[in-house]
Amino acid sequence: MGKNLFVKGYEDDTKEIIQNLISLTEEGVVDYNASVEDWLIENPNVIDSDEKRAILLRMFENSSLAMIYGAAGTGKSTLIKHISQFWQDGSKVYIANTHPAVENLRRRVKDNSGEYLTIKKFIYSYPPDKTVDILFIDECSMVSNRDMIEVLRKKNFKLLVLVGDIYQIESIQFGNWFNLARY
């Protein structure tokens, strides 16, 4: 019976995460597409890829959740940087599971106005009454279900960007949510 309850807990956690993520897809940013188009006209050389321009144009049009999947070297960090550049006047927090991952994110994104934290620091130390415009979570395949639930329960972000590679090292604790969220 104990094992069944343990597995049932994993199932319940996964369902809660997926339901929270689905709820974030119900509404996008008003006039988002027009804002991005204007920004791209004003900054024609910022994004060097038509594919990334197209992604940025649609990213938050109908959803407050964006999910970026890709193997190493596919441009995930570059896309995070472009999103950050578009939201340059907004408040941004970048989180990852480990200190080296956070430092790597800081080095690649180069957003001096953003905050960079480990997931644990965000969960346990970030002020619950402080809402950020956009929360980035990098290396999502390494984020446990339990930690993801805690991040989602804080509900202190307007937009959420989840980034990762499902073939990367998995979470040490149980963490299947990022792979399942693709579907």
Locations of the language-model features?
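Conserved ATP-binding/catalytic motifs of P-loop helicase motor domains
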Residues: 1-183
